[in-house]
């Protein structure tokens, strides 16, 4: 189920007409919001260098990756932690650890080039 969600999420990471933050001073092309088709997580990905400071919301939990201008923000029943990605992971790979609602286990989503049946999930942009 996690693999299927990750693949669908990857396919849905394309520009949309209605972006979170539109009208708050964020350049629309640098802000993307994606909700998983199975509704177990929600992410916002944006380019930090092009986002203006805003006092409208409290600081979210974030995960910082190799590319320091990218932030992954969780909302809802989430647990943000460092991804289990290694130095050999492809550049511009996002990784995250999140709690699946209704369970006590944490699931990982990280860049992985292994065959689908051997990986935890791959999310890229």
Swiss-Prot record:
It comes from the Eukaryota. Transmembrane segments: none annotated. Pathway: Secondary metabolite biosynthesis. Disruption phenotype: Decreases the production of aspercryptin by more than 80% but increases the titer of aspercryptin with Ile replaced by Val more than six-fold. Residues 104-125 are annotated as: Disordered. Induction: Expression is positively regulated by the aspercryptin cluser-specific transcription factor atnN. Residues 113-125 have a biased composition (Basic and acidic residues). Part of the gene cluster that mediates the biosynthesis of aspercryptins, linear lipopeptides built from six amino acids including 2 highly unusual and nonproteogenic amino acids, 2-amino-octanoic acid (2aoa) and 2-amino-dodecanol (2adol). The core structure of aspercryptins is as follows: Ser/Ala-Thr-Ile/Val-2aoa-Asn-2adol. The first step of aspercryptin biosynthesis is the generation of the fatty acid precursors, octanoic and dodecanoic acids, by the FAS subunits atnF and atnM. The fatty acid precursors are likely transformed into the corresponding alpha-amino fatty acids in three steps. This is Aspercryptin biosynthesis cluster protein K. It comes from Emericella nidulans (strain FGSC A4 / ATCC 38163 / CBS 112.46 / NRRL 194 / M139) (Aspergillus nidulans). The lineage of its organism: Eukaryota, Fungi, Dikarya, Ascomycota, Pezizomycotina.
């Amino acid at each position: 189920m996690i693999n299927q969600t990750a693949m669908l999420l990857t396919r849905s990471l394309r520009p949309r007409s209605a972006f979170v933050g539109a009208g708050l001073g964020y350049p629309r092309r640098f802000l993307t919001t994606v909700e998983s088709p199975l509704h177990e997580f929600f992410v916002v990905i944006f380019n930090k260098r092009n986002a203006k400071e805003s006092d409208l919301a409290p600081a979210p939990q974030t995960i910082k990756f190799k590319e320091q201008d990218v932030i992954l923000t969780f909302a809802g029943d989430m647990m943000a932690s460092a991804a289990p990605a290694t130095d050999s992971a492809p550049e511009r790979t996002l990784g995250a650890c999140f709690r699946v609602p209704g369970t006590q286990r944490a699931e990982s989503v990280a860049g992985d080039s292994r065959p689908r049946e051997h990986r935890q999930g791959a999310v890229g942009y």
